[in-house]
From Swiss-Prot:
Belongs to the CPA3 antiporters (TC 2.A.63) subunit F family. Pfam families: MrpF_PhaF (PF04066). The chain crosses the membrane at residues 4-24, 38-58, 64-84. It comes from Rhizobium meliloti (strain 1021). It is a multi-pass membrane protein. The gene is phaF2. One of its GO terms (cellular component) is plasma membrane. Its main location: membrane. This is PhaF2 protein. Residues 95-123 are annotated as: Disordered.
Length: 123
């Protein structure tokens, strides 16, 4: 077998496996019982898309796709951080609260500024 044939076969198998993973991840996003499950599914979807783009770049020889995959990775990371902050700001969902309580746990207050030394030039 020539190296080109091996590369073609390997990229074909990789595309099939990544496509299957993409379908299963979309299923997880649709069926996910909680919002964190869906956010994790979206993060996984971005990772699979990066893999697909990389395999297509190797298969076609058009390596500009790698730059697109890097940009997608950065956007995916920022989206995951934003979703995580959104989930934290919402508090615990009703099904995850401690049974018998109706209150949402509050963040601890910050320690007082007493005892801290002021920086030079600060008011």
């Amino acid at each position: 077998m020539t190296p080109a044939a091996v590369l073609s076969a390997a990229s074909g198998v990789a595309l099939v496996l990544l496509s299957l993973a993409l379908l299963l991840t979309v299923l997880r996003i649709i069926r996910g019982p909680t919002l964190p499950d869906r956010v994790l599914g979206l993060d996984m979807l971005v990772a699979i898309a990066i893999g697909l783009i990389a395999v297509i770049a190797v298969r076609t020889g058009f390596y500009l796709y790698i730059d697109i995959a890097i940009a997608l990775g950065l956007v995916g990371f920022l989206a995951t951080v934003a979703f995580a902050r959104f989930i934290l700001a919402r508090g615990l969902s009703p099904e995850r609260r401690t049974p018998g309580t109706t209150e949402i746990p509050q963040a601890k207050p910050r320690p007082s500024q007493a005892g801290r030394r002021k920086r030079k030039g600060a008011r």
